[in-house]
Curated annotation (Swiss-Prot):
Quaternary structure, from the entry: Interacts with hair keratins.
Protein name: Keratin-associated protein 19-1
InterPro entries: KRTAP_type8/19/20/21/22 (IPR021743), KRTAP_type_19 (IPR051528)
Organism field: Homo sapiens
Taxonomic lineage: Eukaryota, Metazoa, Chordata, Craniata, Vertebrata
Keyword Lyase included in the entry's annotation: no
Primary gene name: KRTAP19-1
Amino acid sequence: MSHYGSYYGGLGYSCGGFGGLGYGYGCGCGSFCRRGSGCGYGGYGYGSGFGSYGYGSGFGGYGYGSGFGGYGYGCCRPSYNGGYGFSGFY
């Protein structure tokens, strides 16, 4: 099980890889995107990622990460704490 996590600009939730796949890229604030996955949306860009592989897609008020579409790598459920996003397996 590998783990990839980081936060950007104080607000931004990260996604951790699971199932031995080791995929999952940190989501950025605003419209920031990292390697075509974890694209931001909804102002703060909580863990959104739509596309052929669907890395770390986000939804809901705080955009808890949930992989779906294609292979759906990099699911996570980060905690919201003082405006910072910390990654964690869920």
